[in-house]
From Swiss-Prot:
This is Arginine--tRNA ligase, cytoplasmic. GO terms for molecular function: arginine binding; arginine-tRNA ligase activity; ATP binding; tRNA binding. L-arginine binds at S200, P201, N202, H211, Y384, D388, Q412. Forms part of a macromolecular complex that catalyzes the attachment of specific amino acids to cognate tRNAs during protein synthesis. Modulates the secretion of AIMP1 and may be involved in generation of the inflammatory cytokine EMAP2 from AIMP1. Interacts (via N-terminus) with AIMP1 (via N-terminus); this stimulates its catalytic activity. Interacts (via N-terminus) with LARS2 (via C-terminus). Monomer. Part of a multisubunit complex that groups tRNA ligases for Arg (RARS1), Asp (DARS1), Gln (QARS1), Ile (IARS1), Leu (LARS1), Lys (KARS1), Met (MARS1) the bifunctional ligase for Glu and Pro (EPRS1) and the auxiliary subunits AIMP1/p43, AIMP2/p38 and EEF1E1/p18. Interacts with QARS1. Part of a complex composed of RARS1, QARS1 and AIMP1. Detected in dorsal root ganglion. One of its GO terms (biological process) is arginyl-tRNA aminoacylation. Its EC number is 6.1.1.19.
Amino acid sequence: MDGLVAQCSARLLQQEKEIKSLTAEIDRLKNCSYLEASPSLEQLREENLKLKYRLNILRRSLQAERKRPTKNMININSRLQELFGCAIKAAYPDLENPPLVVTPSQQPKFGDYQCNSAMGISQMLKAKEQKVSPREIAENITKHLPNNEYIDRVEIAGPGFINVHLRKDFVSEQLTNLLVNGVQLPVLGENEKVIVDFSSPNIAKEMHVGHLRSTIIGESMSRLFEFAGYNVLRLNHVGDWGTQFGMLIAHLQDKFPDYLTVSPPIGDLQAFYKESKKRFDTEEEFKKRAYECVVLLQSKNPDIMKAWNLICDVSREEFNKIYDALDITLIERGESFYQDRMKDIVKEFEDKGFVQVDDGRKIVFVPGCSVPLTIVKSDGGYTYDTSDLAAIKQRLFEEKANKIIYVVDNGQATHFQTVFAAAQMIGWYDPKVTRVAHVGFGVVLGEDKKKFKTRSGETVRLMDLLEEGLRRSMDKLKEKERDKVLTEEELKAAQTSVAYGCIKYADLSHNRLNDYVFSFDKMLDDRGNTAAYLLYAFTRIRSIARLANIDEEMLQRAARETKIILDHEKEWKLGRCILRFPEILQKILDDLFLHTLCDYIYELATTFTEFYDSCYCVEKDRQTGKVLKVNMWRMLLCEAVAAVMAKGFDILGIKPVQRM
């Protein structure tokens, strides 16, 4: 609907410009004989009337759609942008792409939101030799604001800032809607498919701390897109093909010669890999056999394929232990899946004249990229470049993805830029239609600010890290004597929630492009922007109703019958903060930076604390502790905060508990 309005508006403006041009031309003509009716002008005027009529119908339909009750939360920022966009277009119809800047206000004295477009418009008019002050422009914009249900009043401040004050009834109604219908977004990705490529460890190698970020970020990104209504395919592009499998299979044949009939007890696959690598580097005969195994693997020899599957199964079992612990959902689709497509990929690039031969290699130069892609090695083998080209084509043409997101470290940025550019160059996708993005991230550092290693200098095993987290979180809970008030089951749930929640949050709360220091002491601190603090805050909020003997059924009834009052400044601040949730999620869907959600949840928790310290939810007798009065509208605000925090935690992959 919005798109049709915009399209008609653009056509209307174009027609009006043409009418002005023709009218001016007629006025300039001195010879009266030329002033006969212009068929061109009449045709434009008739078309213009039709467009205006159609536009009015569309606008009325849009307004009716807006007023229709919805179970979903509203993105208030987006709605205000639409209003100010209409006002600016009406006030300055001749300006092309005027700036539209609407943001939440940082201080209460500046209202709830601010429109800061006037300064930019002033500069645009100045370039057209029209000198108009930003303040005059702001006044003109406000005069053209359409009638709406959101805004109570606007004020012009300073040089031309437009301060927007929301209607209290509107905010109260939206909070009631949230409580009655739950935390729901409008369906943004209906019939759209998103592929998220993340984790991607190598077969026969253990997952280490380097895989942590991709796994955590990719899972959270997938959950966000699913919540927004997209059909999400989570792919684990494991390294399950290549020359290293030749040495692994040859070593398996030597160590477990009866592997075809008796399942080999490989056990420690990491040690098995190191043994085979040592032999590959030192034994020439073994190296020769390893290469022969690679050739047999590529030709799908049944015995060699069984050995390959055995090795993959052992790895998969170890990976799944970590995925189960962290509640990660993935579909494995490794490099082997794309092997049969490689030949056609090379042929397509050759047929279109993009391939050059360099020292026996087949390479592809991509405009704007400094390093060419190598799609065939000098020995005739394929490369990661070929594999990734085959993967992106399969995802675009067979999966029919609308968005593809690769969650891979910053070190691969140049590689992916080149692969994406090559896919565009050959015509596989148009970036204006299909979004293909590399979600890069920095490395995990130790407290010495160097790459996170064990004391012996080895890479930290991810399973060891998770077990250390469990131990430390239990120590923290016992230090706070929670073991004396929680049941054994509750204590175990709290231990897992804190351990894994803190590890995930410490990662996600940092700007992903930056390196971050891994510190259990910091992440388990229950002060500041940490999962420990937020999980404790959540359990405290959930306990307020319980301690006042108010159950879920009573809260649901109150949500339908009790108006949420927002007269106290802290009530108003909290109510507005709760309703910013959809605009926060929209921002992340646009820029793919999850730390924004962490910052928001922390802001929500601290805003709640301000509210709770200033506004009594439950009034008790100071001597007996007996509940004298329950301010139900405030209890409902508590529940709204908890509902939004719970959904935020869910997107981040964190499992809160009711008691801690």
